[in-house]
């Protein structure tokens, strides 16, 4: 059946249609019965489930659509294997889908508006408590910054050691103290007089100062994720990426060791969330939230509010944030989002935003005011790895509602 349908319908059956079929199948397994509205577009059999893969489905669900007590694990594995083996087949998306993705990128950015609900007010209060513990106040953190170049692509198509040859330096970075003469060689110690008389410094031209309006935008590219939806990557200018790495490393280190977030906000070990997701699937105590357009829905306003209590650190974060993006169409837009994937600060900042928003949701619904002790107690059942979020299962629906109330989008399935 599958072979004949591929011959008639093409590759999209394997890469788009059947993976969607599997999503409905997994939802039905979770409910213990055929999910309402599931398998739309698939011709039904007499028992109510689709005729497609009917031979397997009859070993999982009874004639009334309920999960069998002795459902065949082999049948379940076979359905998932067949439905998902080509879900992430490495193929370029069609021009039509890339055009749709460009429009979705703009629409998502335009939809970001400030929130003023109680969850968001609690979010800001909790952020002030956490930022104090993260040692972000004052200028002390600047002595510990270690800028570096990442392995990824850059806006200027520069790679390898050529990244160290800075030809442009943004005045926004100079204004906060991230100057070429202090950080241009990858340490927080300034370039000395003896350095300046060395041949490599004498022969090198200093970077050209770049005013904010002349900064290059990030280059938005769409890379294969699924054939239905490509992944958005924002390729940063080499200087911005260099500065972002300094703050990113500092923030990640302190979030992973902070009293309130250690073991709950992770960057170096994803297995914590993987083990907890498996445990939650077995026990039903924990649930995983699946975010859509996660990083693209973290707004600049949210990040500014999160770091409001640490204005000096906030200014540094904003100074190394690209403010505009160039789409594959050549259009350039001013960004309302904080950053897309590709910014070195995207991952730690979005992790912090999601972590605090979830805790704020739990406390708001419990009628508990934000304090140091309540931040600690309400964070114990929350685990974040980027946009991989694990929360108490009995609160998952309410937390999802509150995440959406502040502008995020949760895939409900």
Residue ranges of each PLM-predicted region?
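Non-catalytic, polymerase-adjacent accessory regions of viral genome-replication enzymes
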Residues: 1-221
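Core nucleotidyl-transferase/polymerase catalytic module
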Residues: 190-413
């Amino acid at each position: 059946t599958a072979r004949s349908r591929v011959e008639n319908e093409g590759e999209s059956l394997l890469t788009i249609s059947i993976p969607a079929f599997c999503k409905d199948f997994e939802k039905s397994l979770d409910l213990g019965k055929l999910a309402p509205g599931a398998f739309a577009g698939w011709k039904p059999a007499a028992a109510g489930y689709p005729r497609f893969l009917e031979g397997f489905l009859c070993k999982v669900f009874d004639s009334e659509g309920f999960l069998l007590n002795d459902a065949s694990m082999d049948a379940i594995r076979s359905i998932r294997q067949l439905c998902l083996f080509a879900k992430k087949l490495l193929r370029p998306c069609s021009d039509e889908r890339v055009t749709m993705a460009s429009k979705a990128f703009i629409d998502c950015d335009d939809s970001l508006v400030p929130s003023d609900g109680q969850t968001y007010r609690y979010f800001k209060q909790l952020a002030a408590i956490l930022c104090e513990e993260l040692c972000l106040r004052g200028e002390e953190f600047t002595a510990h910054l270690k800028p570096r170049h990442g392995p990824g692509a850059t806006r200027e198509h520069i790679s390898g050691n050529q990244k160290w040859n800075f030809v442009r330096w943004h005045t926004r970075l100079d204004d906060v103290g991230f100057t070429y003469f202090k950080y241009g060689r990858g340490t927080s110690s300034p370039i000395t007089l003896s350095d300046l008389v060395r041949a490599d410094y004498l022969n090198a031209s200093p970077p050209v100062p770049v005013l904010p309006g002349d900064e290059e935008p990030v280059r938005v590219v769409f890379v294969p994720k699924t054939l239905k939806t490509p992944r958005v990557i924002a390729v940063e200018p080499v200087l911005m990426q260099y500065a972002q790495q300094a703050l990113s490393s500092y923030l990640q280190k302190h979030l992973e060791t902070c009293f309130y977030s250690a073991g709950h906000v992770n960057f170096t070990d994803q297995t914590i969330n993987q083990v907890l997701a498996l445990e939650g699937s077995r026990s039903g105590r924990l649930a995983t939230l699946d975010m859509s357009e996660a990083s693209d829905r973290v707004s600049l306003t949210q990040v500014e509010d999160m770091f409001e209590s640490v204005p000096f650190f906030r200014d540094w974060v904003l100074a190394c944030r690209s403010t505009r993006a160039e789409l594959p169409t050549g259009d350039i837009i001013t960004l309302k989002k904080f950053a897309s994937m590709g910014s070195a600060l995207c991952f730690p900042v979005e992790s912090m935003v999601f972590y605090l928003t979830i805790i704020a949701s739990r406390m708001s619904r419990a009628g508990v005011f934000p304090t140091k002790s309540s931040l600690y107690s309400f964070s114990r059942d929350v685990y974040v790895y980027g946009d991989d979020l694990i929360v108490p299962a009995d609160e998952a629906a309410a937390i999802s509602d509150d995440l959406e109330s502040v502008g995020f989008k949760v895939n409900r399935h």
